[in-house]
């Protein structure tokens, strides 16, 4: 008999009423009495489970009543509508086959577990409601972002994980080497000789796909990357991880205004798509994780995003009379408290802050005419502060070279990046969205470790 997905039972209920069906899945809960019992069966295809009713007509009734949680079974039975009951339908079992037994020490028993504890069993946590919802939404949101760009003719570029360049110029990168740590090759100066390493030079895990994406934008016009990035920051916070995913579009013949428009369109599209395609999961988050999630998302979807320059924002903050922990003066990098004040108290909606001081932004951002600020923007949203950072890239070769030298970086490390300006360079712009930060925003999950299947953080690389 053909297997039916639980998702199909929920989406096409009328089609199955009074029909014989077969479902397979794992036992989430089991209650029994002497003559009948109930199984809550989840097959992974849908957030909700299906109720199986079984009784002593089954030859293996007693064996079924003793099954531990998470045992896998195959059930054949009649699909019955139950409109007056708690659940809309159930399956009256005529046959239950055991596919795989679970041990009685299965750690996810029928009680509440803390997220901290569930991180220690990350291989099992997707079986819980919270993480089933989280990682299905992660999948749907990722698809929505791809769909957004593909519908607009963007080319998806697979940028390298192993790189010889540091996009941010911050130096907090993971080294990639095949050197024997107990027998490092040394040069005449006593330093490690990287020419003897696998790639013949120092290489690292990428912190961003932006620079290679720029190369492809100057051939395909509109491109995007969506892949893992790595930061060797020793930050043990709820918002930092050593491995995370970035969405990075790059558009040619474009300025800062264009990239802000693209940012707003993408964010609204992805949120609408998730609300439409994961209603059960979003209802769960809004009820059990963060009761403001749906209100927050609808605020973003239905708002025209505000725009204000950094200089204007500093003035607004200084004149606000608010008691900030971090003093406000021109030149500071805005802290979360400042960002949230602007988006929550001043604009009451998402807002782009533009034209930041050059000293707090990356080398590749286009210098403004004032020589003090760059064509950069951060999107601030109510609830968390900064969500997305973008900029117009510096297309003028001489200005870019001066900036690289000013920051003490090696011009030769960026030879190919500079050549993009040499051979038909043009104005172009892009942004970066930390995918996990976006997921935290739309789910209400408060820790980045809980929106990545197997988080990598300082001192932790289990699984």
Curated annotation (Swiss-Prot):
**UniProt xrefs under Gene3D superfamilies:** Bira Bifunctional Protein, Domain 2 (3.30.930.10), Nucleic acid-binding proteins (2.40.50.140)
Catalytically driven reaction(s): tRNA(Asn) + L-asparagine + ATP = L-asparaginyl-tRNA(Asn) + AMP + diphosphate + H(+)
Top-level taxon: Bacteria
Q: What is its EC number?
A: 6.1.1.22
For the keyword Iron, the answer is: no
Q: Where in the cell is it found?
A: Cytoplasm
* PROSITE patterns found in the cross-reference section: AA_TRNA_LIGASE_II (PS50862)
Alphabetically ordered keywords of this record: Aminoacyl-tRNA synthetase, ATP-binding, Cytoplasm, Ligase, Nucleotide-binding, Protein biosynthesis
A Gene Ontology annotation in the biological process aspect, one of them, is:
asparaginyl-tRNA aminoacylation
Mention one GO molecular function.
Answer: transferase activity
Q: Name one GO cellular component term.
A: cytoplasm
Quaternary structure note: Homodimer.
- Annotated family: Belongs to the class-II aminoacyl-tRNA synthetase family.
- UniProt protein name: Asparagine--tRNA ligase
Q: Which organism is it from?
A: Bacillus cytotoxicus (strain DSM 22905 / CIP 110041 / 391-98 / NVH 391-98)
| UniProt lineage | Bacteria, Bacillati, Bacillota, Bacilli, Bacillales
This protein's encoding gene: asnS
